[in-house]
Amino acid sequence: MARLTSILVFLIAFGISIPSQSSPEVAKEPLQSSVKIPSASQWDMRSVLNGHTYRIFVSTPSSSPPPGGFPVIYVLDGNAAFPVAALLARNTESRSAVTGIVPPVVVGIGYPNDEDYDVSARKRDYTISEKKADSSADEGAADEFLDVLEKEIKPAITSAYPINANRQAIFGHSFGGLLVLHALFTRTKSFTTYLASSPSIWWKERILLNELPAFKLAMSDQPAPYIQLSVGSLEDQVRPPSLAGGTQTSVNKRAMVTETHNLASVLQTFPALKNRFHYYELVDEDHGSSWLPAMSRGFRLFLSNQ
């Protein structure tokens, strides 16, 4: 007993801890922090024009801007699409010395929540209507949104970052692709490159196509922008087949591949768009995945035409 007491005194004196057999050590959870995107920032902006709030994401190159400023690409559904676009921009910058391509500023336009897609807000902002929508509309407010983009978001970006106003692109998918085409047909000078991924041409009995004649006429007396139109080859198929039935009927009515292909066939006949219009049917991509290769190809088209 005396020996055990001496050992305990020795251990305590030298600060040596004694493991407890009855209370095994429990591993602590590692400290956690939010994931950050390099060279990126965000803020919320309440529009004076329509009263809605938008979350603006911006990624900037780390290099010095060229004399004319950086090209800029505006990306719709920013909550989901901005991280991918920002990565593509960083990859472009990392290879700039080899390719000679100037990296872009990326501006994601999203909504102040943690969802990838704000279903109700994007339906409101990205869909078109034959008549002007009011501030309480839940759809068909594309023109009001484009006014916000043109008169509020763009000036805010231009005042804060060295932007080349002669090199501006817009990318959108699904309803976002519909908005991109509507902007192309009705506001042809707003951007120099329009990237429409899997556009919802079916919306409201294809009223988008009513804008084609005026667009063709406008193209006869002004420089044509660069255009990319794309769709996934599997977008008209329901997988797995067990989900067919009502779901397949809905997909058939939208006819994403057929409608996009038909529009491409029309645009390819416009003389002003020769060498400026690019159409892709993306093999083995469905509606949920097609925007990823579409964005990658769109970056290439936009940035390679300096």
PLM regions with names:
Residues 15-19:
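N-terminal signal peptide c-region/cleavage motif recognized by signal peptidases
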Residues 23-306:
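Non-catalytic cap/lid and distal C-terminal segments of serine-dependent acyl enzymes
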